[in-house]
């Protein structure tokens, strides 16, 4: 009899945990991507440049308050270096950085390199004898991009991607 009571208590506890998870999933407004096939190691992702209170959604439009920042639009090409995030034909919303404080680890930036605009992720922020610089890398590239990205080279910071 004692064993049966213990088993029933354990089953009740487990059922309560499962029911709590289901209720949380049903009533939560946050979406949480699940990663069940590969490591849950944290990877760099973009800084939250736009806060929830800066976004207004109505039936037929989305408004984003950029706090006076200068806005740009971009259409990406398919180089495969940022596949999974950016691909051929995707549209990006970008703002022009005003200071180095606008640029964060994980941000996707467009920078000038050999007369081209390259769009890669910031993986390092450093200082040397010439001052501040960023290290960039395409998400699917093995090595970081050659050279240092000085502030003058970084033209845009991506804050939204429209698929």
Regions found by a protein language model. Name each.
Residues 1-163:
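Extended hydrophobic leader/signal-anchor segments used for secretion and membrane insertion
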């Amino acid at each position: 009899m004692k064993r049966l009571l213990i088993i029933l208590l354990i089953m009740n506890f487990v059922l309560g945990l499962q029911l709590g998870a289901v209720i949380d999933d049903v009533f939560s407004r946050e979406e949480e991507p699940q990663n069940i096939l590969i490591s849950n190691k944290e990877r760099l992702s973009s800084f939250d440049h736009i806060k929830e209170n800066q976004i207004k959604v109505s039936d037929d439009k989305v408004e984003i308050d950029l706090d006076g920042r200068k806005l740009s639009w971009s259409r990406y090409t398919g180089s495969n270096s940022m596949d999974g995030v950016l691909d051929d034909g995707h549209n990006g919303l970008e703002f022009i950085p005003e200071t180095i404080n606008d640029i964060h680890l994980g941000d996707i930036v467009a920078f000038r390199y050999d007369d081209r605009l390259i769009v890669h992720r910031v993986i390092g922020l450093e200082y040397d004898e010439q001052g501040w610089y960023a290290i960039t890398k395409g998400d699917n590239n093995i090595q970081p991009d050659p050279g240092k990205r000085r502030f003058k080279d970084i033209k845009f910071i991506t804050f939204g991607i429209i698929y």
